[in-house]
């Protein structure tokens, strides 16, 4: 689908593997794409028309870059900080497509979101205590009567970074210190740990109404707070889908949200969904690849670009199905060392319809729990077959790592 408007100059706020589909969508729309970021080695920069070195989390520097390069739109990347920067620039320059800056900070800051949900009412999310002073948080931890276990999170990080579980007061204090050390804005939340299954619920909003849905189960193996495997669709989603849509549309009305992706993570317990956090951006781990399969070819990245860069949603499909059984696996090394290769049994390999390797053999893995080597995308005939291979047979795919001497 081509753009029939004059060529737009678009600033894309990163160019990692998760952003490449955004970049390709922009090129499909005949945009002149300028990428930025402080990692010039990222693969997407080579696909852009121009790369300008910079820190996309630096609001004023990115605003100056947008003005200097005379861009017509800013496209957020697959990172919460990128969404915040895009909203900041767009508000100052009068670009359409982004939520306003205050709204963006409400959604993409865990403490702000909890406070908003409490004010709005009718949003089922674990109640949280928030702290911007570490000593105050430690004093609270030493005297709290709350029931353990608890979850401690920096308010401003994503992809599971900085999240820890505390099973007692001493451990809680250690988790609080760690979360403050990791948070850029030096603010954390502490909330009860809910025992249940974790899921994702991705929607696309048009005029503050849900126009498309994608659901999935989230599985973690090596790092309990980083999603490693997603299986589509979510188990028992029929129990909670209508209620989640109601809550999303209630938030969309209250915040006057723009068109585009609205994603949330939730815990399913006793037939009810407890919302953990929300975000307005594409998802990591190349989530949109199997999501496109589930949606019968619906291209989440393309429609996100149209919404966020002011192209509008004309031609949006009248319906987006959830058909079939799809999955991805992020290839996470079991330990640090030198990556040597991957072994996949033939009866599993036959389900792999696409892959994307991020690193090659010889790559030195130094942070294995948060550094995916690549991704496998799979499809299955039945839900049971999918769960058996992706979860029960997780260990049958071997990532070979040579330990450093």
Regions found by a protein language model. Name each.
Residues 1-103, 135, 323, 333, ...:
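ATP-binding N-terminal substructure of ATP-dependent carboxylate-amine bond-forming enzymes
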Residues 34-37, 146-147, 311-315, 350-364:
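Short amphipathic beta-strand starts and helix->beta connectors
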Residues 91-162:
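A conserved helix-loop-beta module that forms one wall/lid of the active-site cleft
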Residues 163-273, 282:
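Internal nucleotide-binding/catalytic subdomain
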Residues 167-168, 203, 331-334, 376-382:
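Short beta-strand-to-loop capping motifs
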Residues 243-264, 269, 279-336:
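Active-site "cap" helix and flanking loop/linker of ATP-utilizing ligase/carboxylase catalytic domains
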Residues 331-361:
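Glycine-rich active-site loop/lid that clamps phosphate-bearing ligands
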């Amino acid at each position: 689908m081509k753009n029939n408007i004059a060529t737009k100059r678009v600033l894309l706020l990163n160019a990692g593997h998760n952003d490449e589909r955004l970049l390709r969508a922009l090129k499909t729309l005949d945009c002149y794409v300028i990428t930025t970021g402080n990692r010039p080695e990222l693969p997407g920069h080579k696909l852009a028309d121009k790369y300008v070195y910079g820190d996309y989390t630096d609001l004023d520097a990115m605003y100056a870059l947008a003005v200097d390069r005379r861009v017509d739109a800013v496209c957020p990347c697959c990172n919460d900080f990128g969404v915040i920067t895009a909203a900041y620039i767009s508000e100052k320059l009068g670009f359409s497509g982004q939520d306003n800056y205050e709204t963006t900070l409400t959604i993409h800051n865990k403490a702000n979101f909890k406070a908003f949900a409490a004010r709005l009412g009718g949003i089922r999310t674990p109640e949280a205590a928030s702290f911007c002073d570490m000593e105050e948080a430690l004093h609270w931890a030493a005297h709290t009567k709350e029931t353990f276990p608890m979850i401690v999170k920096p308010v401003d990080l994503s992809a599971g970074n900085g999240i820890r579980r505390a099973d007692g007061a001493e451990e809680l204090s250690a988790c609080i210190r760690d979360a403050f050390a990791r948070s850029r804005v030096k603010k954390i939340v502490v909330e009860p740990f809910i025992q249940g299954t974790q899921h994702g619920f991705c929607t696309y909003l048009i005029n503050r109404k849900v126009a498309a849905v994608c659901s999935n189960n989230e599985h973690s193996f090596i790092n309990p707070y980083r999603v490693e495997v997603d299986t589509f669709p979510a188990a028992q989603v029929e129990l909670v889908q209508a209620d989640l849509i109601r809550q999303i549309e209630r938030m969309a009305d209250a915040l006057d949200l723009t068109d585009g992706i609205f994603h949330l993570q939730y815990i399913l317990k006793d037939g009810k969904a407890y919302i953990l956090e929300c975000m307005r951006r594409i998802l990591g781990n190349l989530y949109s690849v199997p999501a496109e399969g589930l949606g019968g070819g619906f291209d989440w990245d393309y429609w996100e670009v149209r919404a966020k860069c002011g192209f509008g949603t004309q031609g949006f499909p009248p319906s987006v199905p959830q058909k079939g059984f799809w999955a991805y696996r992020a290839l996470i090394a079991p330990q640090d060392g030198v990556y040597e290769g991957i072994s996949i049994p033939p009866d599993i390999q036959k389900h792999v319809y696409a892959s994307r390797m991020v690193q090659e053999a010889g790559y030195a893995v130094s942070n294995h729990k948060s550094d995916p080597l690549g991704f496998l995308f799979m499809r299955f005939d039945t839900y049971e077959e999918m769960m058996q291979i992706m979860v029960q047979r997780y260990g049958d795919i071997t990532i070979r790592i040579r330990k450093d001497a």
